[in-house]
Amino acid sequence: MKTLLLLIPLVLTACGTLTGIPAHGGGKRFAVEQELVAASSRAAVKEMDLSALKGRKAALYVSVMGDQGSGNISGGRYSIDALIRGGYHNNPESATQYSYPAYDTTATTKSDALSSVTTSTSLLNAPAAALTKNSGRKGERSAGLSVNGTGDYRNETLLANPRDVSFLTNLIQTVFYLRGIEVVPPEYADTDVFVTVDVFGTVRSRTELHLYNAETLKAQTKLEYFAVDRDSRKLLIAPKTAAYESQYQEQYALWMGPYSVGKTVKASDRLMVDFSDITPYGDTTAQNRPDFKQNNGKKPDVGNEVIRRRKGG
């Protein structure tokens, strides 16, 4: 029981996770970051259900959340030296004896038949000798523990990498091709596919306990997509989401190690808000409004702009 009571404050004191400002990577990525971003992107794109587009020619429109920005992660890894430190200092007793010289002064006073003699002894105000004696033992003891691990956590500036968007777009096109869906210019397409990428970036965090420490890097990709038939304006694919995250983590003990390194890829939580529950207004008069009914036999008029593009005019 006593051991448990001692461990509770040791584990709970000075605990916390320092999370860096989320950013979209950039600059020259290191290999682990490249691997994580690629893994989350591939997993999210691979999850897209494109079965309704089999055999179709699709025009692809990809829109990615702005990925420009910067942030600093500052502060060093804490040292346990400030928590465990003690010292003992002992000085011997010291006594000093001063020897001051003495001198006698004699004064004689005479008046007629009377006379007096006065004698006095005085000390000089400066010692003639000094003797210092020390008694007892002198000792000094100190104890401490300093663990700095791999040193301070350096400042880092995260910049934008425009090639990330191009990489993600190429992944989507690759999946379309492998699924048997041809991606063509808009003027030759019979289907419009819209992909909105809401989250596409990395998050760094650091966990610090007295005995356990961890460095974690996550990459997240979250997107929403839907498809519309060019002629009928029907929704071939209602709005759907795909979200995945990959993680790289190093685990330390007193910032020594890492004793464990792990990589994982898993489905992430979905978008906080999506468009899967949006339907057209019932009283709309728009000619080209989306048709949410499947196989209803209706074929709304195609707008003039669509006809013009069909004819190549």
UniProtKB/Swiss-Prot annotation:
Disulfide bonds: none annotated. Coiled coil: none annotated. The keyword Signal applies. Residues 282-297 have a biased composition (Polar residues). It is found in: Cell outer membrane. GO terms for cellular component: cell outer membrane. Belongs to the MafA family. This is Adhesin MafA 2. It comes from Neisseria meningitidis serogroup A / serotype 4A (strain DSM 15465 / Z2491).
